């Protein structure tokens, strides 16, 4: 049997041949969602509930799941041939729920539109179930950049402790927090070297000074930094200790060119827990 369905709520378009699925939807932080726009670095889970039609062998079924992500030019950015290749002995869950995780980071970029295609198939039969989902990726709206004669690809917060991009601006004591800028261009290069300065300031809601660094690149004022390394990624990081704090942390990172008037200023508020 064959079926085609467009889920208005979830945004998925699905087509099944001998395989069927009760519901296809997304979850973020264990909550079912119906949006199709995500912040750079955000993770969502694609859920296929009560998948039926697989050929059964001694009560076990053998699904495969492949994922492809393409951009609007239909260029393939990411591909996973089979997320379930480790289940060589099959599955006997009932009802059968199949899931996949996606974190929207490099090679996915903010300010872009993409298509996610998921192909589920029966390794012991001919059944298939294909779902497509169009989504957009935006910059973290809690981060405000001001540019002067520069351009950049991405600006985001990163937790070393959790090894992931911070999208809700909630940070924790004792964690190493990074403010990362990728693809920063516009600085004047001399023999392949640029001469940046980097200032990091932070205050709490009582205007107490929490972070105060005038130039994190002071040691490179004479030698400079290789332009290729600088434009690839530049970052500042900090760690806050203790337990008492007057939220929020108002943070400002300024990166400027010591050889021109080019600069990037990043302001953001973080909540410490």
Regions found by a protein language model. Give the residues of each.
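Short, surface-exposed loop/turn segments at beta-strand-coil junctions that are enriched for proline
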Residues: 53-55, 103-109, 239-245
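Short, compositionally biased P/S/T/A/G/V-rich stretches that sit at domain boundaries
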Residues: 3-42, 138-176
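Short acidic/polar inter-strand loop motif in beta-rich domains
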Residues: 54, 109-111, 121-130, 256-265
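A short tyrosine-centered beta-strand micro-motif
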Residues: 112-119, 247-256
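Contiguous beta-strand segments within globular domains
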Residues: 32-64, 166-197
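Extended low-complexity, serine/threonine- and proline-enriched intrinsically disordered segments
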Residues: 62-77, 195-211
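Short beta-strand elements
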Residues: 128-151, 262-273
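A beta-strand/beta-hairpin structural motif
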Residues: 81-105, 215-241
């Amino acid at each position: 049997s064959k079926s085609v369905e467009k889920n208005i709520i979830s945004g998925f378009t699905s087509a099944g041949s001998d395989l069927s699925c009760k519901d296809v939807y997304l979850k973020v932080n264990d909550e079912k969602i119906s949006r199709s726009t995500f912040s750079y670095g955000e993770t969502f889970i694609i859920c296929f509930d009560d998948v039926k039609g697989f050929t059964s062998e001694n009560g076990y079924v053998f699904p495969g799941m492949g994922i492809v992500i393409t951009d609007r030019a239909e260029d393939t950015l990411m591909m996973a041939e089979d997320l379930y290749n480790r289940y060589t002995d099959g599955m006997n869950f009932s009802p059968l729920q199949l899931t996949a995780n996606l974190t929207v980071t490099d090679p996915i970029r903010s300010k872009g539109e993409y298509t996610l295609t998921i192909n589920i198939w029966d390794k012991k039969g001919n059944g298939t179930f294909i779902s497509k989902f169009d989504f957009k990726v935006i910059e973290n709206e809690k981060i405000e950049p001001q540019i002067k004669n520069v351009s950049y690809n991405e600006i985001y917060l990163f937790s070393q402790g959790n090894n992931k991009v911070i999208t809700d601006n909630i940070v924790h004591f004792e964690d190493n927090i990074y403010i990362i800028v990728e693809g920063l261009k516009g600085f004047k290069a001399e023999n392949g070297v640029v001469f940046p300065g980097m200032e990091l300031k932070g205050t709490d809601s009582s205007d107490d000074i929490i972070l105060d660094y005038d130039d994190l690149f002071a040691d490179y004022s004479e030698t400079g930094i290789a332009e290729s390394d600088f434009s690839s990624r530049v970052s500042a990081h900090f760690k806050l200790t203790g337990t008492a704090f007057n939220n929020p942390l108002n943070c400002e990172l300024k990166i400027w060119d010591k050889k021109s008037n080019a600069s990037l200023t990043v302001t953001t508020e973080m909540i410490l827990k």
